[in-house]
Every structure is written in structure tokens, then in C-alpha cells.
């Protein structure tokens, strides 16, 4: 499969247990793929010091102290797994600080808790996490609390549900998985296509069961074709599934039923799956899922 190249994660931390779960995710990830490194980042907004006369050294010392406290649990988790990490503390807007680090620190993937707390505004979808998903071009994995790994064995984290609809945006999720396999990460993929149900009656005519099955199969196979070829070309173990229904609900339902440890999807898509569009299907999946969701742009 190739040489194990260190995979570098950016983990925003703010002292909340949700942000600590992001560090736990990376620690569990490393159980199957030891070649991991992490950059922990904590940002303190300028308004944290509203009544202070700016004194560069004094404020930066306090920023470092706050960042050290906010990252304590995350650092303990990573150290216990002997993961190499570095802590960055910055004074500034959290979104800007995270986005800059994603660009400048040779990061492969951003991993964020779905919610946060404290003086650093919440890492809640719709706020910092939501903005980062839009701002950075890297894959972003959203990890839910209190502990996304409670039900999962270490290997299950690498049983991935990958949702595709045949669009180039969805195929980026497939390429993400393909690269993981080439890098040496052991993965098993459940490749799914969700087809919108045929209306019960169209122009007064209801389709037969055979007609419906043929429709779903033909549309699903077409949407899955390129993804199947891409995964098969590098020896990824995968199964295909074609299901009719609400895309977000079915993605989450299948992930649970197939005992997947993570959902991977493109942030934009078109076609019969109603579009895996951030703010629509992908946004709903992030809210509905109990397991980590990786969004690939």
C-alpha cells in the first residue's frame, strides 16, 4: 500500500469536553495508523482582555497560560498514545487563527468538536465549526460528544460509510478515502447511493414494484460506477448499497446499521441524491449522526 507518511491533524481546543473528544478521535485513529502528528491550537479573542492596556508581553504570557490550561486534557490524551504534537496559542479571531494554521502548518485534516464552551465562542455547527468547513479547503472531521468512540472498537473507526451521488464533489470524498488506502491506512468502505423515492403516482399512473426497483438500481449503479472503479483500482475493500429515501436520514441510519465508525461525504453534490450540499444533506448529517463525519471539499 505504500510507505506510511505521517498524517498531520489540526485540533482546535478550548477546554470543552467536545473539543477534547476531537483529540480522542485522533488518538483512536492512531491505533490503526501510528504515523500521526497533531497540532493543537487555541485562540483567545482580543475581547478576552477588554479592560487591559495592550502590553504585548503580558497579554501573550496570559494567552499562553490560557491555551495551556485549555489544551491540558487533549495533551494528556495524545501523550498517552505517544503521539507527537505541538501546541499553538494565538491572540485573535478563532476562525481566522484556525484557518491560518490550516494553511500554514502542512495540515492534512482538521478535526473539531461539534460544540465548545468558555470565552472562546462555541465550536458549534453554525458558528466556528461551520465557518471553518466553509473557509478551509482541507477535509474537516466533526466529532460529537460526549464520547464518539464509546460503542466503537478501534478498527471500527476505519469502517467508513462513503455517500456518493455521481457528482464531482461527492467523488472528492472517494478520492480522500483512496489516498488513505494508498498511504497505508487499513479501511473498509460501505459505498452508498441514496435515490429519491419515485412519487407514488405520476400523471395518475403508479409505478409497479419492478419498475421502481429497476429505476433505483439503474440510477444507483450509474452514480456508484466511478466511485467503485476508483476504490477498486487501489484495492480498497468495499461493498455497494443503493437505497431509496431521505438522503440525510438514510445515511445516518445505514451508518449505524452497518456499524461504521465514520461517515465521509463531499460537501456539495447534485443529481438523484438531492445533492450532498453543505447546509442541506451534509449539514443535516452532521447534526443527526452520533459518529464522526468527515466533510471533503
Predicted feature residues:
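Gly/Ser-rich helix-loop-strand patches that form or flank binding pockets
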Residues: 1-5, 23, 32, 99-150, ...
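General small-molecule cofactor/ligand-binding pocket signal
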Residues: 39-41, 86-90, 141, 190-192, ...
Amino acid at each position: 500500500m505504500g510507505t506510511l507518511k505521517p498524517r498531520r491533524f489540526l485540533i482546535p481546543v478550548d477546554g470543552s469536553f467536545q473539543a477534547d473528544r476531537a483529540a480522542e478521535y485522533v488518538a483512536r485513529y492512531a491505533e490503526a495508523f501510528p504515523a500521526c502528528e497533531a497540532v493543537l491550537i487555541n485562540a483567545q479573542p482580543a475581547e478576552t482582555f477588554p479592560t487591559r492596556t495592550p502590553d504585548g508581553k503580558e497579554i501573550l504570557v496570559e494567552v499562553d497560560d490560557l491555551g495551556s490550561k485549555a489544551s491540558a486534557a487533549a495533551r494528556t490524551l495524545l501523550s498517552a498514545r505517544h503521539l507527537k504534537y505541538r501546541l499553538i496559542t494565538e491572540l485573535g479571531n478563532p476562525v481566522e487563527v484556525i484557518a491560518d494554521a490550516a494553511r500554514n502548518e502542512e495540515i492534512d485534516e482538521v478535526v473539531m468538536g461539534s460544540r465548545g464552551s468558555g470565552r472562546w465562542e462555541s465550536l458549534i455547527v453554525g458558528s466556528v465549526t461551520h465557518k471553518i468547513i466553509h473557509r478551509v479547503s482541507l477535509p474537516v472531521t466533526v466529532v460529537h460528544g460526549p464520547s464518539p468512540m464509546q460503542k466503537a472498537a478501534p478498527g471500527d473507526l476505519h469502517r467508513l460509510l462513503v455517500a456518493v451521488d455521481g457528482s464531482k464533489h461527492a467523488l472528492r470524498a472517494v478520492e480522500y478515502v483512496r489516498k488513505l488506502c494508498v498511504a497505508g491506512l487499513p479501511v473498509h468502505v460501505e459505498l452508498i447511493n441514496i435515490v429519491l423515492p419515485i412519487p407514488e403516482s405520476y400523471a395518475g399512473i403508479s409505478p409497479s414494484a419492478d419498475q421502481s426497483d429497476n429505476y433505483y438500481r439503474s440510477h444507483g449503479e450509474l452514480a456508484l460506477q466511478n466511485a467503485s472503479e476508483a476504490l477498486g483500482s487501489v484495492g480498497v475493500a468495499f461493498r455497494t448499497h443503493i437505497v431509496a429515501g431521505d438522503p440525510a436520514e438514510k445515511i445516518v441510519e445505514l451508518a449505524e446499521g452497518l456499524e461504521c465508525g465514520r461517515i465521509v461525504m463531499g460537501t456539495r453534490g447534485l443529481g438523484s441524491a438531492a445533492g450532498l450540499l453543505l447546509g442541506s444533506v451534509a449539514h443535516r448529517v452532521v447534526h443527526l449522526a452520533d459518529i464522526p463525519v468527515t466533510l471533503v471539499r
